[in-house]
Curated annotation (Swiss-Prot):
Binds multiple chlorophylls and provides some of the ligands for the Ca-4Mn-5O cluster of the oxygen-evolving complex. It may also provide a ligand for a Cl- that is required for oxygen evolution. PSII binds additional chlorophylls, carotenoids and specific lipids. One of its GO terms (cellular component) is chloroplast thylakoid membrane. It is found in: Plastid, Chloroplast thylakoid membrane. Keywords: Acetylation, Chlorophyll, Chloroplast, Chromophore, Manganese, Membrane, Metal-binding, Phosphoprotein, Photosynthesis, Photosystem II, Plastid, Thylakoid, Transmembrane, Transmembrane helix. It is a multi-pass membrane protein. The keyword rRNA-binding does not apply. NCBIfam families: psbC. Residues 1-2 form a propeptide. This is Photosystem II CP43 reaction center protein. InterPro entries: PS_antenna-like, PS_II_antenna-like_sf, PSII_PsbC, PSII_PsbC_sf. [CaMn4O5] cluster binds at E355.
Length: 461
């Protein structure tokens, strides 16, 4: 028995019996038409780049320099600012022209890609194998597939090195840890030690460790891009020059749908990692542009009230809270001094406005009494009222914070969207992997419904 609604439907001379695909799987037409598939990919790239350029110009047109970026619903300008364009000390925007240039360059690029996509989809050769053998391929050709993989890896490596070049030679990048509250600087002293760079990969993902998401200085981030770019380029050269070994030929499925499933799996992993990075990391995603992280807003609230009550005469070192623990300060299980109250669970936050007040054993009481600077108070009060919480129609911020501002943080947008997209890509990976494996094993029509277990079970009622 087939699971079709209408197996006899024929569209454009195709039907399900002869092609193995239903009418709604339109992309299946392109599986063996490398020229048309190229057109679809180039046109898709054009749409992506058009969105980037148009959205970029939209954000520039709506941007108000007097308000922080994270209060304005911006998701592209913070990325440009993080790369050091248009900003000065403290993350203040001093020039929006670079943002305008970025938008226009992307729009022009999208026109070129759009023309190429339409050309290859409608006018160019249906298949590339005959006229352009270098660009042609057959999905089963394992050697050609690993060559294409190698070319992609080299392009990714070049992309990683573009960030390195920007940080080292072309004006530098924004460093939220620069003294006095952040600034654009060139990265001079790269971290290239493999024990440091790969040490991040070996860390636990949990509190106080945080795997690669715990990276908190730009030297490590840019050094990591040197390593990653080098590995991608060397791996790319390797895959271009070699043929797959016997174990790889046996272990992997070599079909277009299998490659689709591998790609979806990889993108899913990227999405989940990006979600954690933008939610927790305030070095790669500086709080000046993206707003504070959740832990940062919570710790900022504790710090703000510590400052207030200390001015009013409270002894913040010994005041007891309603639970019998310290009201403002307490000790973590391992002995360091941390903020007390509900924010104790965020004890492992590191932020540029707070670190100067730490000593060798956590927060330093004498520094808290004598060394708090006005910029630290201002920044923590600002972050306290801008927690990345709240849904689209709610007042953003901590529910108990009466001064919270009505906004939705770009951290919420970016973390949520990447989690959801990562999840859907993962489901797509499972779906296409299952289909590809079934096709390779020769039973792509699904399980035989005549002998399904449910048929021999008693009715539920």
């Amino acid at each position: 028995m087939e699971t079709l609604f209408n197996g006899t439907l024929a569209l454009a001379g195709r039907d399900q019996e002869t092609t193995g695909f239903a009418w709604w799987a339109g992309n299946a037409r392109l599986i063996n038409l490398s020229g048309k598939l190229l057109g679809a990919h180039v046109a898709h790239a054009g749409l992506i780049v058009f969105w980037a350029g148009a959205m970029n110009l939209f954000e520039v047109a709506h941007f108000v320099p007097e308000k922080p970026m994270y209060e304005q619903g911006l998701i592209l300008l913070p990325h440009l600012a993080t790369l050091g364009w248009g900003v000065g000390p403290g993350g203040e925007v001093i020039d929006t022209f670079p943002y305008f240039v970025s938008g226009v360059l992307h729009l022009i690029s999208s026109a070129v890609l759009g023309f190429g996509g339409i050309y290859h989809a409608l006018l160019g050769p249906e298949t590339l194998e005959e006229s352009f053998p270098f660009f042609g391929y057959v999905w089963k050709d394992r050697n050609k597939m690993t060559t294409i993989l190698g070319i992609h890896l080299i392009l990714l490596g070049i992309g990683a090195f573009l960030l390195v070049l920007k940080a080292l030679y072309f004006g530098g990048v924004y460093d939220t840890w620069a003294p006095g509250g952040g600034d654009v600087r060139k990265i001079t002293n790269l971290t290239l030690s493999p024990s440091v760079i790969f040490g991040y990969l070996l860390k636990s993902p949990f509190g106080g460790e945080g795997w690669i998401v715990s990276v908190d200085d730009l030297e490590d981030i840019i050094g990591g891009h040197v390593w990653l770019g080098s590995i991608c380029i060397l791996g790319g050269i390797w895959h271009i020059l070699t043929k797959p070994f016997a174990w790889a030929r046996r272990a992997l499925v070599w079909s277009g749908e299998a490659y689709l499933s591998y790609s979806l799996g990889a993108l899913s992993v990227f999405g989940f990692i990006a979600c954690c990075f933008v939610w927790f990391n305030n070095t790669a995603y500086p709080s000046e542009f993206y707003g504070p992280t959740g832990p940062e807003a919570s710790q900022a609230q504790a710090f703000t009230f510590l400052v207030r009550d200390q001015r009013l005469g409270a002894n913040v070192g010994s005041a007891q809270g309603p639970t019998g623990l310290g009201k403002y300060l307490m000790r973590s299980p391992t002995g360091e001094v941390i903020f007390g109250g509900e924010t104790m669970r965020f004890w492992d936050l590191r932020a540029p406005w707070l670190e100067p007040l730490r000593g060798p054993n956590g927060l330093d009481l004498s520094r808290l009494k004598k060394d708090i600077q006005p910029w630290q108070e201002r920044r923590s009060a600002e972050y306290m009222t801008h927690a990345p919480l709240g849904s689209l129609n709610s007042v953003g911020g901590v529910a108990t914070e009466i001064n919270a501002v009505n906004y939705v943080s770009p951290r919420s947008w970016l973390a949520t969207s990447h989690f959801v997209l990562g999840f859907f890509l993962f489901v797509g990976h499972l779906w296409h992997a299952g289909r590809a494996r079934a096709a390779a094993a020769g039973f792509e029509k699904g399980i035989d419904r005549d002998f399904e277990p449910v048929l021999s079970m008693t009715p539920l009622n």
